[in-house]
């Protein structure tokens, strides 16, 4: 999988920009707030239709404009592919694959796979459970685009059920028949999410443990555990569904009192344990970076294994923050097999071999141009 070109129109701080990628590694260098991360965000949007930096499309469209656009040309084993994402400040999107409109997100997702590693990913360790759930969901969307539909379905049921519980708080009367219907829908959609998250971590956890040992010199033992809100006993859908309903019964009074749903995968946790200690309580920022790097390498390898092609790797202002050992581990892993886009404010911390084989682009005020150091092939 190779991203050949990217065209940005009225996206973030870009007016009109076309970037042709000429090497397996591209380094985007520039001061802060010039547009480096915006370019990686555009790739992320094409990959998952989600942004880890914004939940509102009006923030993605250049100020003063109504519409923005991202177009990518990709080379896959199956042949070339054009992807177009049209953004509107009112939140309505249109999607195209090879210039043909697609109505369902499902038909757009899965064409471009990318793994992003940014300084914000330290929140995987020290942040809330929601950060770790969001990470799981993004991986699943790439491995199984249908998961995006299941997640949307679940969140819709969750919002409706919460609105129903809040109406009980206001009005003081409860329609038990309607509540039972919402319980069944929440349990049904929630079961489908829970099973997929469980299966993902069964495959991802050993890879993360392997990479963590390799990077830390086998001095630390990482364990990654799925802690679902509804405890799992096996993978049988009916058993999980019944366990879901039972827990809803147990929490019924508390939910009615609080006016919100207390049961379901929206309250799952992913436990990260180093040497039998929760990682958020463990060690330095460097050790936390090691953990996140191990998770990202595991994600990279699993996506490659499942889709049969190496995904893109997006490194947003993190490579220069890694010490030489971690840099070398990352270099050794990706080599030239994974196309890599890297942002940085300076080139001083980079390995000479990286610079020698990389395309170097400068970014200033939403404009990208070739550096004097650029490989001009």
Swiss-Prot record:
ATP binds at residues 30-37. It holds the Pfam family SMC_N. It is found in: Cytoplasm. GO terms for molecular function: ATP binding; single-stranded DNA binding. InterPro entries: DNA-binding_RecF (IPR001238), DNA-binding_RecF_CS (IPR018078), P-loop_NTPase (IPR027417), RecF/RecN/SMC_N (IPR003395), RecF_2 (IPR042174). GO terms for cellular component: cytoplasm. Keywords: ATP-binding, Cytoplasm, DNA damage, DNA repair, DNA replication, DNA-binding, Nucleotide-binding, SOS response. GO terms for biological process: DNA replication; DNA synthesis involved in DNA repair; double-strand break repair; SOS response. Disulfide bonds: none annotated. PANTHER family: DNA REPLICATION AND REPAIR PROTEIN RECF. Belongs to the RecF family. The RecF protein is involved in DNA metabolism; it is required for DNA replication and normal SOS inducibility. RecF binds preferentially to single-stranded, linear DNA. It also seems to bind ATP. This is DNA replication and repair protein RecF. It comes from Cyanothece sp. (strain PCC 7425 / ATCC 29141). The lineage of its organism: Bacteria, Bacillati, Cyanobacteriota, Cyanophyceae, Gomontiellales.
